Amino acid sequence: MSNQAGNYFQTDTSLAENERKQRKATNSQGNPVKFRSKILAVDVNYFWDPSGDVVFVAEAGGSVTGLRLSTNELSATPRGPKAPLTSLAFHGSKSPTDASTTMRVFAGCWDKSIWRYTLHSTDGPSKSMTLTECTSFPAHTDFVKCLAVARTPDKQDIIISGSTDGDVRFWTVDGQSLGSLKPDCRGIECLVIDPLSSSDSPVVMFSTSKQDIFAFTLPESSKISTSHIQLSLPIRAHETSVYKLHFDDDGDLWTASADKTARHLSRNDGWRTEATLQHPDFVRDVTTHDKYGWVITACRDEEIRVWNKTTGELHHVFSGHYEEVTGLCMTGNLVISVSIDATLRRWSLAPADLQKAVEKAKNPKLLEQEPEPKNDMSMLTEEDEAELRALMESEEADILEKMAMDEQ
């Protein structure tokens, strides 16, 4: 144990880990942008800018913040909830009578509600927008973990939400309940729309904390409350929680799991596992760059890995985050990553840039620490950070306990 006054209750191991993170925090790999609090989700907002230059993040401090990648300009919404935001979804609509655009940003929250931020523009979605509403509606009996926007066969846009309460629920974009689905699972981790399903029979897939992946066909909006939605047989490619689902351009499914693997599930082979990518810790997210044939994964060990999509071989590891990586998204040739360290970083997969990164990784002298990025944004209080970490560790401990139970 350390005998220094402020560190009396910390072990030598924890002190060494804190010192390691403090040293690593000074690096500028990935051109980091520091946010107010830990980041739990990220996504590209094509309604704001069709070029993909604007991403939004969901923060543990209760804020939704937009970032223009080309300028690092921030567009923060007013802080709504006093609890962490876990997930994002976007919806946009144009007025049939004028050039105005209405955009809604939805955020799932630990306060069991869905927060809605409505923005209005008369100059098109790539121009500046004015926030006209910040509100929420009660959605679940536990944390809201994931959101998706879907269009029903009768051409109505709806919100689908999943929660640790194990329910999938359906809402109008104005927050009116349309119905719910109660699969036999512990919690819902991720919701995605099958891009190869038809508009007349849209298919929704979702993953669970129990290991199962399910699919169902979305009925007309007026029939959701009365329809008996038929779930597919479960896809069981993993040993425990499946955190993320991602469809590549071929319509195959990629998964990220707490069993320390990412997997490629083949559509043409009944969603059987085509490839398994092993990791040293929980895999939090997965995405693909189909043009260049890469699979990108985010791991709890702070690293972003780039894999050869065809061979499954590890090609490169991007290092920069100094806490767990929580989310990924792709825009053009850029991989965007976010982390518990409250930074957003970007990594280029353009062939010349990726080759340069590989060469740097082979020469440690080229990766010496650089000046700490500027940070003039306030952070969570120590009390808030401790609470967030305790909740996340509790969730992870629960996962490990359930894994042990499943193995018995």
Task: Please name every model-derived segment.
Residues S51-D53, S93-S95, T102-M103, Q156-D157, ...:
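Short coil/turn segments that connect the beta-strands within blades of beta-propeller domains
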Residues G61-T65, W110-W115, D142, D165-R169, ...:
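Short coil/turn segments within WD40 beta-propeller repeats
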Residues R36-F47, K82-T97, T141-R151, C185-S197, ...:
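Canonical WD40 repeat/beta-propeller blade segments in eukaryotic WD-repeat proteins
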Residues S2-T26, E313-V317, Y322-T326, T331-L334, ...:
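Terminal intrinsically disordered, low-complexity extensions flanking WD-repeat/beta-propeller proteins
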Residues L69-T71, L119-T122, T172-Q176, P219-S221, ...:
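Short loop/turn segments that connect beta-strands within beta-propeller blades
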Residues N31-G62:
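Beta-strand-rich domains and repeat architectures in extracellular enzymes and scaffolds
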Residues V55-E59, V105-C109, I159-S163, V204-T208, ...:
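Conserved beta-strand element within WD40/beta-propeller blades
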Residues Q29-K34, L74-G80, S126-S128, E133-A139, ...:
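Short C-terminal beta-strands that terminate individual repeats in beta-propeller domains
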